[in-house]
């Protein structure tokens, strides 16, 4: 398992590659879908994942221990970064056969889907300041689709404009402060496609 980490020396902006000697990731996923003829379909999935370092003796110190007497820490047994215990998605689509510009094999459709994930660590060495709370997102799309010929649809990602973090990370210089990568705000778009 490889993790990009920061040095503990103040003023050094460069990271280094550190190898955790042994990690373990266990999980299970359930998924299902159902279609009612050609007009309605739903799907869903949920997963449970547990990941932890079995042995990582030379890990960087967490953010709150930066500047202390130790440059490295044994975090064996701690959880792995970026892994939510629970995550999943659910969605559905309603579609009706339709003609569009002479095409008779297409459908008008409206589809919605949502995803969620629970809280997770954003740091290679677990830190109480670098945990990201769980969140859910909703997406919507509607339009006309066809296996051949012209298709178009309008869409929105993060329809409810949920504020969330994708990542929290120690800022440059290792002075104990941190920065964030913000998740995308609500966006809208139009997709045009032509299949031969």
Feature names for model-found ranges:
Residues 3-16, 54-77, 124, 166-181:
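Solvent-exposed loop segments that connect transmembrane elements
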Residues 18-121, 195:
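Gram-negative outer-membrane beta-barrel transporters
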Residues 24-26, 84-88, 134-138, 184-188:
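Residues that define the transmembrane beta-barrel architecture of outer-membrane proteins
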């Amino acid at each position: 398992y490889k993790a990009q980490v920061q040095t503990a020396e103040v003023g050094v902006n460069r990271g280094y590659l550190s190898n955790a000697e042994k990690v373990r990731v266990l999980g299970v996923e359930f998924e299902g879908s159902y279609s009612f003829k050609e007009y309605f379909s739903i799907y869903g999935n949920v997963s449970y994942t547990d990941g932890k370092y079995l042995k990582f003796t030379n890990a960087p110190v967490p953010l709150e221990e930066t500047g202390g007497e130790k440059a490295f820490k044994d975090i064996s047994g701690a959880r792995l970064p970026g892994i939510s215990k629970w995550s999943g998605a659910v969605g559905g689509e309603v579609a009706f056969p339709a003609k569009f510009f002479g095409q008779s094999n297409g459908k008008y459709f409206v589809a919605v889907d949502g995803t969620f994930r629970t809280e997770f660590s954003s740091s290679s060495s677990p830190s109480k300041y670098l945990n990201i709370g769980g969140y859910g997102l909703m997406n919507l799309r509607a339009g006309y689709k066809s296996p051949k010929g012209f298709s178009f649809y309008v869409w929105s990602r993060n329809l409810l404009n949920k504020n969330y973090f994708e990542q929290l990370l120690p800022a440059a210089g290792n002075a104990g402060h941190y920065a964030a990568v913000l998740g995308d705000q609500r966006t809208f778009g139009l997709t045009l496609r032509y299949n031969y």
